[in-house]
Each structure stands twice: as structure tokens, then as C-alpha cells.
A protein has these predicted regions:
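Hydrophobic alpha-helical transmembrane segments of membrane transport and translocation systems
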Residues: 263, 268-271
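Interfacial loop-to-transmembrane junctions
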Residues: 239-261
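Membrane-embedded alpha-helical bundles of polytopic integral membrane proteins
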Residues: 2-220
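Juxtamembrane boundary at the C-terminal end of a transmembrane helix
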Residues: 271-277
């Protein structure tokens, strides 16, 4: 029996057994393996986004250009946060992002250039920017690379997703946002919150650079913002009548599906930690 013929739960378990060790190794080994991992994941997620947008009628987002801008943003953020280059290098983005207007002048087949410019920028803001901000999170403590905060956030995200999945499957009756995502339930969300708080308690005892209260707060942010991140992507996918952004990761869909909860969480987590530390 092939992996695609297995149940959703079986596929999720296999994906976790393969994917989690790779993620943890890249995060723990060095800041450069961390960069390489999320640079690739971010670029693939952005490509998935543009592919979805391109499937909507006559939309023609600049896929290569948008993904290239996302990669440049990610690299700049990494080396600036690492302290290798100064913040003034962010000015590189200004002419780079402006180039899209010149490029569109030569796209004679594009009947709605400004609509597609907007979709191109949306891919940068919605997908590339949060992955770049993940680097800010990794260097948030004294400008030194801290794998613990990244791993902690991922553990909380996985705990929340798993708790929501099992609680929703077993007890889910009260719809959370039926118009957008019929399968999501309040019971599932509560289950996700409970498992996230359990993991936050454990993190508070082992990753002591942050207090247990801070881990609780980060957990709540991930549960709330992550749920809305899922709903936002569900709304987007429903508007183009698809179920998953791709089928790259068995049991989860694509990279955009797997990390959508993290995309909206990261800006709030960074803001919280900047204010309380």
C-alpha cells in the first residue's frame, strides 16, 4: 500500500517521523543550517502561493520576481540580525520592489497589471515576510542565535495542531467558523489550547531563557493567531475551490498548509517579546 492510500493520520505520522528530525537538526546544528532550511521552505511556500493565484482565471503574478524578492528579504534579515551587515542594507529592497512597475510595462499579455502587481506583493507580505521574521525571532535575545525559541514555538504549534486534530475528531460538534472551514470546531480549538499549555509548562522548565509565563503567552498567541492563520488560508483556498495548497507533505498538503499557522503568529510573538524583555 502506497503512502497516498494510507489514512490521514498514518500519513501525518510518517511525515512527522521524517520531517521533524530534519527540522530539529537544521535548527540545532547552526544558524546557517537554520537559514538554509527556512530559506528553502519559505521559497517553496511562496511558489505554492503564486501557483494558487495563477490558477484563478487570468491572474499572472510575477512568480520568479516575487520569490526572488522574498529570498533577498530573508537573506538581508538574516545577515542584519546576525550583525554581519548594517540595517541600511534594507534600502536595497526599495529599488528592487519598485522594479515590478517597469517589468509590467513590458508584459503585453497582462490585461490587469495592477491586480497582478498586488498579488505579487501579497505573496511577499503574506508568505516571505513571516519567514524572514522567523530569523528576527531566532536572534531576538542579545542578537545571538537562539535555537530554543524557534524550537519552542514549533513545539507549541505542533502541540496545538495535534490537540486540535484529535479533540476535533473525537468531540468536535460546535462549528468555529463554518462559512470558511466547516471541519474546525470550538472543541478542537480548546483541545489545541490545552495541549499547548501543557507543552508551555514543560518549556518553562527546560528552556529557561524565557519564563513559564512568557511561554504561556507565546502558546496563547500561537493558538489564537495560528487558528486565524488557518482560517485565512482556508478562505483563500475556498475562493479558488481547492482543498490543499499542494500535496508535497503527506497528510498535511503543501508547505503553505503546514506553516500557515506560523505565518500570522510570528509578528505577534516578536512584538510580545520585544515589549516584555
Amino acid at each position: 500500500m502506497g503512502i497516498r492510500q494510507m489514512s490521514n493520520l498514518q500519513q501525518r505520522i510518517i511525515a512527522a517521523l521524517i520531517g521533524v528530525p530534519i527540522l530539529l537538526f537544521c535548527i540545532l546544528y547552526s544558524d546557517y543550517t537554520f537559514l538554509g532550511l527556512f530559506l528553502i521552505v519559505g521559497a517553496l511556500a511562496q511558489l505554492e502561493f503564486y501557483k494558487l493565484v495563477g490558477s484563478m482565471g487570468d491572474n499572472l503574478p510575477l512568480t520568479f520576481y516575487g520569490t526572488f524578492c522574498g529570498i533577498v528579504l530573508h537573506l538581508l534579515t538574516f545577515f542584519i540580525e546576525k550583525g554581519d551587515v548594517g540595517y541600511q542594507n534594507y534600502y536595497i529592497l526599495s529599488p528592487l520592489l519598485t522594479l515590478i512597475f517597469f517589468i509590467k510595462l513590458y508584459k503585453s499579455k497582462d490585461e490587469k497589471p495592477f491586480k497582478n502587481i498586488a498579488y505579487t506583493f501579497l505573496g511577499i507580505i503574506y508568505v516571505a515576510l513571516p519567514f524572514a521574521l522567523l530569523t528576527v525571532l531566532a536572534f531576538i535575545q542579545d542578537d545571538k542565535y537562539d535555537p530554543n525559541i524557534v524550537m519552542g514555538c514549533l513545539f507549541l504549534l505542533w502541540a496545538s495542531d495535534s490537540g486540535a486534530y484529535f479533540a476535533g475528531t473525537k468531540f468536535g460538534k460546535t462549528k468555529l467558523f463554518e462559512r470558511v472551514s466547516p471541519k474546525k470546531s470550538w472543541e478542537g480549538s480548546i483541545g489545541g489550547l490545552v495541549t499547548a499549555m501543557v507543552v508551555a509548562t514543560i518549556l518553562g522548565n527546560y528552556f529557561t531563557n524565557y519564563t513559564t509565563f512568557q511561554w504561556y503567552a507565546i502558546g496563547i498567541i500561537i493558538v489564537v493567531a495560528g487558528t486565524y492563520g488557518d482560517l485565512v488560508e482556508s478562505l483563500f483556498k475556498r475562493s479558488i475551490n481547492i482543498k490543499d495548497s499542494a500535496d508535497t507533505i503527506p497528510g498535511h498538503g503543501g508547505f503553505l498548509d503546514r506553516f500557515d499557522g506560523l505565518l500570522l503568529s510570528i509578528p505577534f510573538i516578536i512584538t510580545f517579546l520585544k515589549l516584555v524583555r
